[in-house]
């Protein structure tokens, strides 16, 4: 017969765990909205900056211009910037990014190209350190809401590696935030810089609302803005080369900040979803244990009655 006290203790333990997961879900839900707003507010500036650079490059296409950040050279070594979180309990968020990074590392190895890792986030740092991977730099204890200073610090390290020709290309591996239920690890080339713009056609503006004690999501599709082209007769006060040279580091740092923000929003959304699932599983387990407890208690009462009746008959 099951031990009633052990079942009661187990039910209480699961209830305590559910309180923790529910609290973590509420905290993540409060933060994910702010992170999502930052992501969507950053993208228009990043896209406009990319359009400016694209137009300037087009204006200088037939000029003899030497800009180090745009220089294409034979690729012998690639720096991989891998962005994960510092903490767990966020479903497959960290695992998916690390798995994508390992796939890219294997692809480079098959092509005979060396690689170095620059990791942002404790989970990636711990994982690759245990496997003795070549780590050129690591950045941990980043803010949950990334800042421009953090992006600038990482950007300075990447610029140093690229301009010193320690690496010939810099690739970014991060989780692109689309919505609460959609986030995908992607690879983007950071250096040499390209101005391809940002894909926003799948984005959603959403708000969290509560209904019967549960979160519901109201979604609205985000419309992409058409690209703007400078008129050919536009006159620049400064030399376009000087403008381009000044904007390139800003563009790099902006791309990094956007990636960090999208990764942070993806992590918070994944944590909210994981804690919501954990709370639901805890509720189901409490129900199962309660039924087991009631059956065991009923069996114990029945057994006692049988013993009383048997004792009375014996007299």
Curated annotation (Swiss-Prot):
The gene is atpG. F-type ATPases have 2 components, CF(1) - the catalytic core - and CF(0) - the membrane proton channel. CF(1) has five subunits: alpha(3), beta(3), gamma(1), delta(1), epsilon(1). CF(0) has three main subunits: a, b and c. GO terms for cellular component: plasma membrane-derived thylakoid membrane; proton-transporting ATP synthase complex. NCBIfam families: ATPsyn_F1gamma (TIGR01146), PRK05621.1-2 (NF004145). Belongs to the ATPase gamma chain family. Its main location: membrane. Gene3D superfamilies: 3.40.1380.10, ATP synthase, gamma subunit, helix hairpin domain. This is ATP synthase gamma chain. Produces ATP from ADP in the presence of a proton gradient across the membrane. The gamma chain is believed to be important in regulating ATPase activity and the flow of protons through the CF(0) complex. HAMAP family: ATP_synth_gamma_bact (MF_00815).
């Amino acid at each position: 017969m099951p031990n009633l006290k052990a079942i009661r203790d187990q039910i209480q333990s699961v209830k305590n765990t559910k309180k923790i997961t529910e609290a973590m879900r509420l905290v993540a839900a409060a933060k994910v909205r702010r992170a999502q707003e930052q992501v969507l507010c950053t993208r228009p500036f990043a896209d406009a900056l990319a359009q400016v650079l694209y137009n300037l490059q087009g204006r200088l296409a037939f000029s003899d211009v030497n800009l180090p950040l745009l220089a294409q050279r034979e690729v012998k070594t690639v720096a991989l910037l891998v962005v994960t979180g510092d903490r767990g309990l966020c479903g497959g968020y960290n695992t998916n990014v690390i798995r994508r990074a390992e796939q890219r590392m294997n692809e480079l190895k098959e092509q005979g190209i060396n690689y170095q890792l620059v990791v942002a986030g404790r989970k990636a740092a711990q994982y690759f350190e245990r496997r003795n991977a070549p780590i050129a730099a690591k950045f941990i204890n980043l803010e949950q809401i990334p800042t421009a200073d953090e992006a600038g610090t990482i950007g300075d390290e990447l610029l140093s590696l690229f301009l010193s020709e320690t690496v010939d290309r810099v690739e970014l591996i991060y989780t692109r935030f689309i919505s609460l239920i959609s986030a995908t690890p992607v690879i983007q080339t950071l250096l040499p810089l390209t101005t391809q713009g940002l894909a926003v056609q799948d984005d959603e503006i959403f708000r969290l609302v509560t209904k019967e004690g549960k979160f519901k999501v109201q979604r609205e599709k985000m419309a992409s803005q058409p690209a703007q082209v400078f008129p050919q007769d536009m006159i620049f006060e400064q030399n376009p080369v000087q403008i381009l040279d000044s904007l390139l580091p800003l563009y790099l740092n902006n791309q990094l900040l956007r990636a960090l923000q999208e990764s942070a929003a993806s992590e918070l959304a994944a944590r909210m979803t994981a804690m919501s699932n954990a709370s639901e599983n805890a509720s189901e387990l409490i129900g199962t244990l309660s039924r087991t407890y009631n059956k065991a208690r009923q069996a114990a009462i029945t057994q006692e009655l049988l013993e009383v009746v048997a004792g009375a008959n014996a007299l």
